[in-house]
């Protein structure tokens, strides 16, 4: 019983840490035409590679929702759905496909996640702002944001073996 409680506490703390990082990176962005470029995709993709799909949704979806709620509330529901789905797909691909080739599974996951993020935000912006032109204006920057998040998370996970480190932490 105590072992299960300790594992649940560790899982909760690791998930909360990644969610806090997501919220912090949602608080500022690089100015670009039509808005800002945010770096929280790095945390969303990295956490999704490391954590299970439930924790990935909490970090990606709920973390982005809270970040938007605090700093820029207009797209907060788009962020909840888009980043939540993005994180779940990345996590599922990283943990349940190509088990003998985890790097390939992670690359597949972040690639699918990038597509989900770009499509979700493009459709969401067109709906929220009532103009597809605004969504198209932001499209190249959404692609750049998704690419930066995907590539950086793969590099972080490969170079520093973050999945192995966090799996050891979560097993204790």
Residue ranges and their predicted role:
Residues 1-172:
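Loop-helix junctions at membrane interfaces
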């Amino acid at each position: 019983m105590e072992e299960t409680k300790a594992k649940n506490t560790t899982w909760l703390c690791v998930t909360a840490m990644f969610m806090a990082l997501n919220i912090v990176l949602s608080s500022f962005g690089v100015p670009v035409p039509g808005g800002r470029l945010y770096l929280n995709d790095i945390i969303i993709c990295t956490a999704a590679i490391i954590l299970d799909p439930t924790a990935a949704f909490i970090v990606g979806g709920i973390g982005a929702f809270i970040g938007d709620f605090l700093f820029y509330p207009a797209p907060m529901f788009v962020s909840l759905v888009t980043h939540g789905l993005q994180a779940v797909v990345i996590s599922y691909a990283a943990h349940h496909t190509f088990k003998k080739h985890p790097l390939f599974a992670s690359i597949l996951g972040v690639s699918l996640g990038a597509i989900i993020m770009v499509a979700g935000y493009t459709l969401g912006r067109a709906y929220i702002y009532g103009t597809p032109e605004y969504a198209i204006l932001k499209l190249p920057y959404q692609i750049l944001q998704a690419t930066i998040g995907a590539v950086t998370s793969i590099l972080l996970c490969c170079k520093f073996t973050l999945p192995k480190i966090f799996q050891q932490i979560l097993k204790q």
